[in-house]
Regions:
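Iron-sulfur-cluster electron-transfer modules
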Residues: 1-143, 148-182
Length: 182
């Protein structure tokens, strides 16, 4: 936060407030369910056509109901889901293309958004890096915890960070550079 006359770190102040609300059990339970991106992503991906139809902002049937029950503004654009996640695609095609002898290697943590809502971004990133003669590996142990951070759930974020950092450190020890998409 740039310096200003009140010298308040507003983002951290909001995080502390949300954490305090959580401790007092005054946080929004619906928001807690929406932040379970892996559970939601796995489920919604199986029904992506129906989910995408029902979450379109132009849908005059379902969006007013979502606004009433979930407090999601009916005009808000929501991310699409795909019937195959990025990890599903990668399990089917682990090829690296034609790589010359290379020592350049990258491990990509795609984030839950790319995995469930934009798998093409991950596939294109792999393709571009392979064209640049860079070996690419992906790992996805689960959501990084950013949605929980927004809700002040510091414990969940810390638990997820521990798992992610343990996995990443193994790649770093082998000489991989780390890249995260979105």
């Amino acid at each position: 936060v740039p310096p200003h006359e009140f010298n308040i770190d507003f983002p951290h102040l909001m995080l502390r407030y949300r954490n305090l609300e959580r401790k007092k059990k005054k946080h929004n339970k619906v928001d807690d369910q929406l932040t379970k991106t892996d559970r939601n992503g796995k489920f919604f991906s199986k029904f992506s056509n129906l989910v995408n139809w029902s979450t379109k902002s132009s849908n005059k049937i379902t969006r007013p109901i979502m606004e009433l029950l979930l407090k999601i503004d009916k005009e808000a654009e929501l991310p699409k889901f795909y019937n195959q996640t990025l990890i599903d695609h990668l399990k089917k095609d682990e090829s690296q293309g034609q790589l010359d002898q290379t020592t350049d290697k990258v491990v990509i943590f795609p984030t839950c958004f790319v995995n469930y809502n934009n798998p093409n971004l991950g596939l294109l990133t792999k393709k571009i890096l392979n064209k640049l003669n860079i070996k690419v590996e992906f790992f996805y142990e689960g959501c990084c915890g950013m949605p929980q951070l927004e809700g002040g759930d510091i414990k969940s974020v810390a638990d997820k960070a521990k798992i992610t950092s343990e996995t990443l450190s193994k790649y770093v020890d082998k000489g991989y550079k780390v890249l995260s998409i979105v």
